[in-house]
Amino acid sequence: GFTQALIDLKDTMAGKTVYAVAGFGALAFENVSQGAALYSRSSDGKVGLARAAGTLDEATVVGFAQTAKNTGEEVRVLTVGVLATSGLDAGDPFYLATGYGGITSTPPSTAGQYLVRVGEASTTANLIIQLEPPILLS
């Protein structure tokens, strides 16, 4: 019956989990590394490295760089899905760091900085992208 059909389907499926990602392409106004948190400059729509210790513009994360790109090159910005990275603790929430393009499991707490949740670690090497708007700390 139905149960056997599900078992048969499971047996024929590949063993690897495939994660769907979605994003968009944009020109980089500075060099970006793979996995860097990015913001879109309001003046021209080009993307660069986001940071929690900058302006509201710089703290508004639009996604993560899928691959490293140089200034003037088009970078694919991942906005939904799973970002392959390293150094994570599974289950921990992650926030935009005060340094350019970085993320941290320790949320910023200094007045004048922005608190920006960007996702949650599903494993030590995968970040589930969950972008939230910045909150100015006072």
Segments the model singles out, each with a brief description of its role:
Residues 2-138:
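Glycine-anchored, exposed beta-strand/edge motif detector
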